[in-house]
Amino acid sequence: MANDILLKIEGLRASVEDKEILKGVDLTIRKGEIHAVMGPNGAGKSTLSAVLAGKPQFTVTAGTVEFLGQDLLAMSPEERAWAGIFLSFQYPVEIPGVTITNFMKTAVNAHRAGKGLEPLKAGDFLKLMREKMAFVQMKPEFAKREVNVGFSGGEKKRNEIFQMAMLDPTLAILDETDSGLDVDALRIVASGVNALHTPDKAAIVITHYQRLLDYIVPDVVHVLKDGKIVKTAGKELVAEIEEKGYDNL
């Protein structure tokens, strides 16, 4: 049904520094669905996530993107976040001098302000933060640490899932969030993503590898190659990619 559609992309083309990366992407995501986007290096997977998040270095040259019936491309990056889009980065950045507590307090209250809500009271914020840190098995002392400074790869990714839990997005875009994770960290990150998923939300999981999709099972799998989606199927496509590779699909 049309009212179940969260995200609708039609004919999306995008460039960076005059080089066309996305060459006509069509994609529809409905409430409750998890979509995996797979493909070789340079296919345009991270460009797609960056365009959806509104990164300014990417120029959309054609196509439309609607999120909950609104023109996503007309929104600023902040407005997209307030509307319910969350992007997990492949390489989370360090923010020296800013504690996780202060960072999240600013982010949560900015989201609330964007929706016309009052800032959370200090006690309510700290209670929410403790709950979500326990949810992703993050030690309480991390709240006092500077954002991602000195964190291992797994700790950075766990911190991102914690941020996602705090912001409670409608559409989560996970851009190669499995990069550099050992098996234990992968399980924790995946369990957090699965636990946050509800019938009213959706997720786009961008990955090279089958192993993440053993834990976050997709409803739909797309192969993005040379800027276009060349194949779409169910979760069985993951095993086909593992067996044949991208060139033989």
Per-segment meaning from a language model:
Residues L7-I9, L22-G24:
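Conserved structural motif at the start of ABC-family nucleotide-binding domains
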Residues H35-V37, S49:
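Short hydrophobic beta-strand immediately N-terminal to the Walker A/P-loop
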Residues M38-A43:
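The feature captures the beta-strand-to-loop junction immediately N-terminal to the Walker
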Residues T64-R80, N148:
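ABC ATPase NBD Q-loop/coupling interface
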Residues V93-T170:
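ABC-family P-loop ATPase nucleotide-binding domains
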Residues I173-T177, D184:
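Walker B catalytic motif
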Residues V220, L224, K228-L249:
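Conserved beta-strand-loop-alpha-helix hinge in the C-terminal portion
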